[in-house]
């Protein structure tokens, strides 16, 4: 009898899970975990397009800073969008801000959300612990998505019981400006989950592209080796960083040279990605560490955000 009961419960659980993954979700309520530039940007565009948002981080001070940054960003948007109607611009800002709540307790706010977007530190253990905890409190239909730029989505999803409702949703900084979103589908991600995230991305006014769960996805898989090759060109003394930047802007039509872009993105971010790829595939020459990059990061010279990287900033 006990065996029959167990089999029945497994059948019910399996059927319930299949039902949840088979349904296409229209995302209305979004929980964003992480109040940094990326998380705040995602919260802003979601709220500005009619979604209710809860922004989560560890302290009220961080959240207050995030909310202030969102307000400043929204006012810039309103100034352009409502240049001839300042009152409408103010109303847009206030209405958008009113749909963004904040919390320091993620578990308490995911019970009724349609989508959780994680944008925290690029650390697999930390992400796994977060999603494992949220998995216990989130509604059955809730989709989980990670904004990771360097970790495998499958490795993060494995911490949960909803691999079919787990995918990557990779935005680009600054989120309110950059139009692209990479939607990452793992072997376990259901088609309905994928379609729900594509629709959500479009609702944000973004252009979604699809990619399998491969290291770096599309943009970083092509961009990071290009940046690293520019560094190696400079390290060999083949050309100065200034001339390399000028060549790529005037010769290839790029808006920024590789060293300008490295400093803008953050040298610590690039090093983290390269180190992760090197660990996975040490023999690949494209993933070899750079002495110059390592030295600058060790000296806490991360680029524009610290005032110095490959270039110095006032």
UniProtKB/Swiss-Prot annotation:
Positions where N6-(2-hydroxyisobutyryl)lysine occurs in the chain: 127
One Gene Ontology term, aspect cellular component: cytoplasm
Subcellular location: Mitochondrion matrix
GO biological process: cell differentiation; fatty acid beta-oxidation; negative regulation of insulin secretion; positive regulation of cold-induced thermogenesis; regulation of insulin secretion; response to activity; response to insulin; response to xenobiotic stimulus
Positions of CoA binding: 73, 80, 149
Tissue-specific expression: Expressed in liver, kidney, pancreas, heart and skeletal muscle.
Residues annotated as transit peptide in the record: 1-12
Chain positions with N6-acetyllysine modification: 81, 87, 125, 136, 179, 185, 192, 202, 212, 241, 312
Post-translational modification as stated in the protein's UniProt record: Succinylation at Lys-81, adjacent to a coenzyme A binding site. Desuccinylated by SIRT5.
Activity-pH dependence: Optimum at neutral pH.
Sites of N6-succinyllysine modification: 80-81, 87, 136, 185, 192, 202, 206, 212, 241, 312
Chain's role: Mitochondrial fatty acid beta-oxidation enzyme that catalyzes the third step of the beta-oxidation cycle for medium and short-chain 3-hydroxy fatty acyl-CoAs (C4 to C10). Plays a role in the control of insulin secretion by inhibiting the activation of glutamate dehydrogenase 1 (GLUD1), an enzyme that has an important role in regulating amino acid-induced insulin secretion. Plays a role in the maintenance of normal spermatogenesis through the reduction of fatty acid accumulation in the testes.
Subunit comment: Homodimer. Interacts with GLUD1; this interaction inhibits the activation of glutamate dehydrogenase 1 (GLUD1).
Protein's UniProt name: Hydroxyacyl-coenzyme A dehydrogenase, mitochondrial
Organism, as annotated: Homo sapiens
Gene, per the UniProt record: HADH
